[in-house]
């Protein structure tokens, strides 16, 4: 096993521990409080994949971080901060919407790269909006924390979340996953729209009602429908 992979996991475990302690004392704002919840599943998945115990890794990570801090001068810290591009955290969902449990009558799940797409196929003829919490850098989506599909009544009927065992995804991965989710929901005659924040940063192209361009398969389906009506 690569030593850098192990040390990276150990450092991540300790940094998660620090964030969790900070959050437990209610010292963080909403974006900060979201991160420990989202990263916990990822660490468990990585620990299982690497065969490493999280508690032991956290202790080792503490030693790594302490050693770095001992060697770090104030001037070097200022230079590091100045050279790192700042990312922004954007929220469509409240903490309650993020953490709420939901159930599917007719569950369907699909994995697309490092993202898991889930939807309830029993939902029909509903108006649905997609909301997401994510970070942005250089005016593009950097990391998706969680995306959920809501009916007008507030019920959750779909979700896109990063797989804990496969960290890392691009804005293109998210765009493709959203297309899959929209296609699945629209198959049952639901009307789906995307929040303006997500639309703006997940992809650049859009049509007049702030919807993503239809994938080729959906375009062919729509064309056949129009032809049959004519």
From Swiss-Prot:
Belongs to the influenza A viruses NS1 family. GO terms for biological process: symbiont-mediated suppression of host cytoplasmic pattern recognition receptor signaling pathway via inhibition of RIG-I activity; symbiont-mediated suppression of host gene expression; symbiont-mediated suppression of host mRNA processing; symbiont-mediated suppression of host PKR/eIFalpha signaling; symbiont-mediated suppression of host type I interferon-mediated signaling pathway. This is Non-structural protein 1. Residues 1-73 are annotated as: RNA-binding and homodimerization. GO terms for molecular function: protein serine/threonine kinase inhibitor activity; RNA binding. One of its GO terms (cellular component) is host cell cytoplasm. Upon interferon induction, ISGylated via host HERC5; this results in the impairment of NS1 interaction with RNA targets due to its inability to form homodimers and to interact with host EIF2AK2/PKR. Inhibits post-transcriptional processing of cellular pre-mRNA, by binding and inhibiting two cellular proteins that are required for the 3'-end processing of cellular pre-mRNAs: the 30 kDa cleavage and polyadenylation specificity factor/CPSF4 and the poly(A)-binding protein 2/PABPN1. In turn, unprocessed 3' end pre-mRNAs accumulate in the host nucleus and are no longer exported to the cytoplasm. Cellular protein synthesis is thereby shut off very early after virus infection. Residues 180-215 are annotated as: CPSF4-binding. Residues 223-230 are annotated as: PABPN1-binding. Keywords: Eukaryotic host gene expression shutoff by virus, Host cytoplasm, Host gene expression shutoff by virus, Host mRNA suppression by virus, Host nucleus, Host-virus interaction, Inhibition of host innate immune response by virus, Inhibition of host interferon signaling pathway by virus, Inhibition of host PKR by virus, Inhibition of host pre-mRNA processing by virus, Inhibition of host RIG-I by virus, Inhibition of host RLR pathway by virus, Interferon antiviral system evasion, RNA-binding, Ubl conjugation, Viral immunoevasion. A motif (Nuclear export signal) lies at residues 137-146. SUPFAM superfamilies: Ns1 effector domain-like, S15/NS1 RNA-binding domain. A motif (Nuclear localization signal) lies at residues 34-38. Homodimer. Interacts with host TRIM25 (via coiled coil); this interaction specifically inhibits TRIM25 multimerization and TRIM25-mediated RIGI CARD ubiquitination. Interacts with human EIF2AK2/PKR, CPSF4, IVNS1ABP and PABPN1. Its main location: host cell.
């Amino acid at each position: 096993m690569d030593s850098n992979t192990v040390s990276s996991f150990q450092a991540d475990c300790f940094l998660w521990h620090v964030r969790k302690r900070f959050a437990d004392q209610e010292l963080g704002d909403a974006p900060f409080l979201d991160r420990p919840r989202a990263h916990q599943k990822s660490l468990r998945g990585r620990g299982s994949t690497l065969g490493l115990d999280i508690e032991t890794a956290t202790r080792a990570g503490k030693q790594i971080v302490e050693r770095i801090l001992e060697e770090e001068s104030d001037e070097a810290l200022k230079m590091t901060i100045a050279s790192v591009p700042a990312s922004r955290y954007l929220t469509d969902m409240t903490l309650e919407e993020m953490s709420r449990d939901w159930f599917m009558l007719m569950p369907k799940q699909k994995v697309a790269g490092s993202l898991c797409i889930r939807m309830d196929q029993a939902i029909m003829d509903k108006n649905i909006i997609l909301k997401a919490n994510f970070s942005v850098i250089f005016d593009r989506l950097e990391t998706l924390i969680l995306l959920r599909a809501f009916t007008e009544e507030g019920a959750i009927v779909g979700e896109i979340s990063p797989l804990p065992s496969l960290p890392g995804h691009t804005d293109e991965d998210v765009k493709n996953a959203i297309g899959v989710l929209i296609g699945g929901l629209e198959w049952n005659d639901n009307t789906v729209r995307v929040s303006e924040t997500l639309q703006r940063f997940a992809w650049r192209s859009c049509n007049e009602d702030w919807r993503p361009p239809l994938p080729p398969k959906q375009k062919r389906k729509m064309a056949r429908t129009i032809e049959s009506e004519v």
